[in-house]
Amino acid sequence: MNIAETISFIRDLYGEKEAFIPLHAPTFAGNEKKYLEECIDTTFVSSVGKFVDLFEQKVAEYTGAKYAVVCVNGTNALHIALKLSGVKAGDEVITQPLTFIATTNAIVYAGAIPVFVDVDKDTMGLSPTSLEHFLKENAELRGNECYHKQTNRRIKACMPMHTFGHACRIEEIIAICDRYHIDVVEDAAEAIGSYYKGKHLGTFAKIGGISFNGNKTITTGGGGMILTNDETIGKHAKHLTTQAKVPHAWEFVHDEIGYNYRMPNINAALGVAKLEQLDGFLANKRATAEAYKAYFEKQGITFFAEREYEKCNYWLNAIILNNKEERDAFLTETNAKGVMSRPIWQLMNRLPMFKDYPKTDLSNAEWLEARVVNIPSGVRKINND
């Protein structure tokens, strides 16, 4: 691949001849300032206020979830989702090694042990085939609970991720886990605006979590959301994330261990403004992805594109290079020339704090780790929009 030509193409695409092009920077072009000023003028800048309730309502409507509970970040959302799935200290939670560390950290926050199972190359998400093989070889049912025969620990949950906003084979994963009485928690942190078979990601399992970090498709500066269609889970999620405080006009009564995971109203105000612009952001990002796909096909480079029945938000565009040497050369030259690119995350099982946890053969994840590069994916300025 001609890297210099690719840098020139990206600069032309973003209309930036010399300036630094980040991977994904936020765009503020709507009611952000107006809503922030309202928070300040009314003094409702903390965890109670109009925009907290409105943001939850609007995200629920957009995703089709019956309940949406806002949190201070996506990691907290996953932590609470695991707790509400019944995960306890000493349990095992199956997940993928190819993920951002928040996925694995949330498992450890819940006191559980991550078990790393391989991914599919075409989704970069948890592989149902690898999951099925792992469970056939290692799991047994004891009553209505699943146990790991080798460790004698309960396998309570499975947390696949929709990588870069692309759908994993979530229906197959849920079907397998249902047979083994394993709860599924959907890590849809990167997937706001992504659909599979017309259904928003994060709403297939009983509970899921999304993120509104500063680099996401829409941002609240920092933030996350728990999605569920289960009334009991939805109400309990709200209770736990607000310090488990029993409603009362003046008394402070708490009935269980809760968490200060509340999103401030001032952050939720940003979220409401961003959600109003989401459809435009998605159309803009899709046009960018289509331009990339056409360009890289001519270069003989694989562009990570959506599959059949999938409508991806293209949060972060990715290309798959031929080997690690080619990947490293691309990373070095693009970043040196002010066009940001990055490798995919280092596999979780390679990190010192996770290296001794159980894992399967991870050949696909290792193959992708050596080849995947993310390229600029933020909303472009097109005709002043």
Q: Where would I find each of the regions flagged by the language model?
A:
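Phosphate-binding glycine-rich loop
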Residues: 45-92, 106-108, 116-118, 140-150, ...
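Active-site phosphate-binding strand-loop segment of PLP-dependent enzymes
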Residues: 122-220, 225-227, 232, 374
